[in-house]
Amino acid sequence: MEPEIYRRMGLTDAEFEKVKAILGREPNYVELGMFAVMWSEHCGYKSSRSVLKLFPTKAPWVLQGPGENAGIVDIGDGQAVVFKIESHNHPSAIEPFQGAATGVGGIVRDIFAMGARPIAVLNSLRFGPLDDSRTRYLMGGVVGGIAFYGNCLGLPTVAGEVYFEPSYACNPLVNVMAVGLIEQKNIRRGTAAGVGNAVMLIGARTGRDGIHGATFASEELSEASEERRPSVQVGDPFREKLLIEACLEIINEDLIIGMQDMGAAGITSSSCEMAARAGTGMEIDIALVPRREEGMTPYEVMLSESQERMLLVPKKGAEERIRAICRRWGLEAVIIGRVTGDGLMRIMENGRVVAEVPAKALTDQCPVYERERRRPAYLDEVRQRDLSRLPEPEDYGRVLLGLLAAPNLASKEWVYRQYDYMVRTDTVAGPGGDAAILRVKGTSKGLALTVDGNGRYCYLDPERGGAIAVAEAARNLACVGARPLAITDCLNFGNPEKPEVAWQFYQAVSGMSRACEVLRTPVTGGNVSFYNETESGAIYPTPVVGMVGLLPDIEKRCGIGFRREGDLLILMGETYPEIGGSEYLATFHGLVAGEPPALDLEREKAVQALVREVIAAGLATAAHDCAEGGLAVALAESALAGGLGAEVELASDLRPDFLLFSESQSRILLAVAPEARDRVLDLAREKGVRASVIGRCGGHSLVVRINGRTLFNLSLEEMGKQWRESIPVLMAR
């Protein structure tokens, strides 16, 4: 076989030799394609698998960790929550609407493949600067695609984040998280047990869309990528809705042994993963696969990533009942093969063997690389900058208004108003707060959901940035009163074959692992997205954390908005002169430099525990974490959310701009009734947390004084205008 054939599929010379050694012969074209997709970074995790072992994955409440379609955690009363996050970065860069739409469809299938009813979607998005017309095109397409698929499915998109940085200009990030609820007795896994059992394909017909989508997602983007539009799948959310209902009915009737979504690598991945988990094999006749296009080759059928398809292994005798259920939902259900006991994936076409490969060779024997790691030279340059010598602002009101208008901090209502976040009627707190809250019907419980990440911090210090991503997600849950349970992560990085990127990846995972250990948030699964890189360079290293938390009593929840005149403002935690990597530094000084804020995880843990206790006791009327933009922006956001101003008096030796815009970690702003003040301060003392009364809610302006000097007095109207109109105005250009 000519080297350019397997190289074009993404295999190296050494990997091709390993394939030959496993088979004892040269692979044919179909077999080569199967190895290429399953040994891609997207499916095989060959550059990340050894590093991912750093993550803590076990806890008494974790029912399913990494290795399945999605993670599962116990929430009591025989119920569990199923959740996972994945990326659809490369497809969205080429075809933003369909790339993002099918990102939603794929992650939702992972949820109901476990037997759970999907209940919510979240997303984490990264684009280039909004003054660029292509960025506006990409953002419009991505948001439209997410809205289209989620709204048509009848799933609320309840939370998310959107950031804009030059490093994402050519390579946007589209990370989508889905969440489901399940009775623990209904949990199913993707396994193909029982020799002789049928293998059924249900759902959509198979076409040529998405062929080699997995290998496309395992290479750098270039001008030639525009020609890869056939690698972008096309989604049909209405068919997926039918598929959800049919699959859940099949599970409720206990008709199957296992079920797997046909995502990346299509029939190839779903079949070999199910067989490998069970230690079995499969014989599949691709002539039986329903097709929507004529003349498809065995290679195309095996590698197609056509959407809205599931692979099932029914219990013996259940095949006709499954067909009847699918007919009722307007879906095809076809037996395409059977489970075998020889461990081989035997692919037939009308009685002819077109591929024969050991199932575990495709999964367990994927090469694992220990990539060379090297600290990037740029870190010395960006950290040498003496930020204490920056000029102080003359007009602090102008600075705050400018920060509120900065796209990273401005209202994202332009985005989330396109999503139906109230559908299903379980959304108690939707977009715009620190975390979304969904009720668990029939109980007093609530689920709290968030996604968080900061690529700028990770660019300056990936270990600290990774830890902060976990800490901030948990802090956001604490602000609504929820205890964090576990995380799913989406790790977005450049080319791992470059030592600097491999170093960033290792450092970020190390930091995340450290935070997960201290905060007791095990990792239940996720996704690694490498090769987010173009000729102009790599993206910022961007680990994104999706976190699920539990509210034992949904009535004891908190929001970010100031609600009552006369309530006192208490700042939990301490402020240090930490503006490295801050929004203030980037927006007003044009710099991405310095070190990101320090993170003391034990202090973080104490602050979060304190705030949860205060909220559970009914002592807080508002809670908001101090994150990007610092204390000043947190105050403005809470004032705008509640439609109520505040007067704040700070006493400090810090420079005013550092005090107001520092992004020091482990800080939460609380509003409490005056009569609750002493009890809250006593609780803080007991937990060793610094708590300072800094002001009072009231009026229609935000007034901030430092050491008796008024820094700004801004009306809610002028702040709201800057904050709300920024992104709509930019998108309308």
Swiss-Prot record:
Residues given in the record as Mg(2+) 1 binding sites: E86, N527
Keyword Electron transport: no
UniProt-listed GO biological process terms: 'de novo' IMP biosynthetic process
Binding site for Mg(2+) 2: D110, D261
HAMAP family: PurL_2
NCBIfam families assigned: FGAM_synth_II, PRK01213.1
The name this protein goes by in its record: Phosphoribosylformylglycinamidine synthase subunit PurL
Species name: Moorella thermoacetica (strain ATCC 39073 / JCM 9320)
Annotated gene: purL
